């Protein structure tokens, strides 16, 4: 199967998206559209791609907190790309979210509810009957609610369940759904995580390139499957300390 020639990236200014775009270009991707909250953060990526590869890059500013996809008809710009990537995410202020409804809703909005207009349009009836792929970054946090990050985990769990439904809907379609349950990644969002548990965003990108047309749910790195199995089955008294 021919490699992706075009990619539509939501969360284009994230470190993970940065390295995925570079690795896509290395493998022959020629056209990119970056959706980001702050377009200035895309400058380094755009400069690198244009200097090293013959690519076409467009971008648009969109804040997932404001749901601009519906307000300014941004979803009409989605078009037909070979790969759609959702790499956006917001951990938020975990302590504040326990008592502040605004921060709690901010976490749920950015990580799930305001992604829905995009995902629904990406997987419209016409598009899923053609070849293409949707990669969605979820999180191992979605596997069990824990005191340390249950708002973030709940939002990612909702995203995972929704996309799992899409995965099954597209089971016999040429369009593939790939749900990535990522563990700790060495990015600003994962700055407080133990370093020995972190994987670099470049390694994440290289791993995804090994099987670009893969369908299904996967843990990244793979050993998080074992870790989260243990987390899911431990008694509540122990889980309350996580």
Regions found by a protein language model. Give the residues of each.
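Conserved NAD(P)H cofactor-binding loop of Rossmann-fold oxidoreductase domains
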Residues: 85-93
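Conserved glycine-rich Rossmann-like NAD(P)H-binding loop of the short-chain dehydrogenase/reductase
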Residues: 29-44
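Catalytic Tyr-X3-Lys loop
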Residues: 90, 97-117, 159
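Active-site loop immediately N-terminal to the catalytic Tyr-X3-Lys motif
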Residues: 144-150, 193
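Residue(s) in the substrate-gating loop at a strand-loop-helix junction
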Residues: 139
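C-terminal helical subdomain
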Residues: 179, 194-229
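Active-site helix of classical SDR
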Residues: 119, 155
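Conserved glycine-rich cofactor-binding loop
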Residues: 13-14
